[in-house]
């Protein structure tokens, strides 16, 4: 809070881009809306400047061909903190931030990047918290470990097309203090919280000692009003954490999603299971490549000889 901020942006991509500072109090020239400020064209450079006068949870994203560039991952979160570790002047103190950025991905838009996709046509296939989902949220770096008696500020923001519905177990003692970068008139205890696209909240938790559980994060399709998927954010007493001394990272396949073949650098063989758990491939790779042009659309799990695994999608 109170600092002067400069964001230096270089655009090496073949498309024009901007950085829209979503929710921050900036002047029009630095707001990143191309019709009222400027584009950063291919090979171009620009600097965005603003004063961080208000503490809170904010977002940023590209505002060029917004539907496509959002689902391609051009977004993030900005936190403005007070030096004294209080949420706002006269507000409660906390021990640390725990940012939770919700987003989703429509695979079709990444496979057809030159097509037009109006907002109402976007139907996400992948639903994420801080860019990961499913079992990945159980990795140590994505678990929120707490020390009893030390409040944690959950910084919640949605860049998803979905409506988020969060479920806070009562053992978290969750209280909402801020909405869209400003203190709420009266803080309130929260067990369920809806977050619409672009919204931000700051929720303080002070879990009970010894607690080990999850915050449920439901992703609802807004046009169809259907529950698409639920992710779970793990919260646990730090004394219950166990160092994972032998953890190794699985090789990353590319492109992912794919419609013809996927390549891994390193492993010579693997086994692949479909979403129903059926083994669909087991054997050596051809120079790291796996041919999938005749495979059915869906999600697959690749298991490597060292026991690590990763998921990939086939979309035709």
What are the functions of these language-model segments?
Residues 44-48, 142, 191, 199-203, ...:
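Short strand-edge motifs at loop-to-beta-strand transitions and within beta-strands
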Residues 2-4, 148-151, 254-263:
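Short coil/turn motif common to extracellular beta-sandwich-like domains
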Residues 70-107, 186-249:
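Extended terminal and domain-junction accessory segments
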Residues 94-148, 157:
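Acidic-aromatic/histidine active-site loop/patch
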């Amino acid at each position: 809070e109170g600092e002067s901020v400069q964001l230096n942006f270089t655009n090496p991509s073949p498309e024009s881009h901007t950085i829209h500072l979503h929710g921050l109090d900036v002047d029009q020239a630095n707001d990143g809306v191309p019709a009222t400020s400027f584009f950063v064209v291919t090979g171009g450079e620009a600097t965005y400047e603003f004063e961080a006068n208000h503490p809170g949870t904010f977002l940023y994203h590209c505002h060029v061909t917004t539907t496509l560039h959002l689902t391609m991952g051009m977004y993030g979160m900005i936190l403005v903190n007070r030096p004294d570790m209080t949420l706002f002047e006269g507000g409660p103190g906390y021990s640390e931030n725990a940012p939770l950025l919700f987003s989703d991905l429509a695979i079709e838009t990444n496979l057809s990047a030159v097509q037009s996709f109006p907002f109402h046509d976007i139907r996400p296939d992948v639903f994420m918290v801080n860019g990961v989902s499913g079992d990945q949220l159980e990795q140590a770096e994505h678990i929120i470990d707490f020390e009893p008696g030390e409040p944690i500020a959950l910084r919640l923001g949605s860049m998803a097309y979905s409506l988020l519905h969060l479920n806070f177990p009562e053992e978290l003692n969750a209280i909402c203090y801020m909405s869209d970068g400003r203190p709420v008139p009266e803080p309130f205890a929260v067990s369920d919280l809806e977050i619409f696209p672009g919204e931000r909240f700051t929720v303080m938790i002070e879990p009970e000692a010894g607690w080990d559980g999850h915050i449920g994060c439901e992703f609802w399709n807004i046009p169809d009003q259907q529950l698409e998927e639920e992710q779970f954010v793990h919260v646990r007493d730090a004394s219950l954490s166990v160092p994972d001394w032998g953890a190794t990272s699985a090789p990353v396949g590319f492109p992912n999603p794919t419609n013809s073949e996927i390549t891994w650098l390193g492993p010579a063989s693997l086994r692949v299971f479909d979403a129903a758990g059926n083994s669909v491939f087991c054997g050596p790779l051809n120079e790291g490549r796996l041919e999938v042009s005749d495979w059915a659309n869906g999600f697959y799990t690749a298991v490597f000889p060292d026991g690590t695994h990763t998921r990939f999608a086939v979309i035709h």
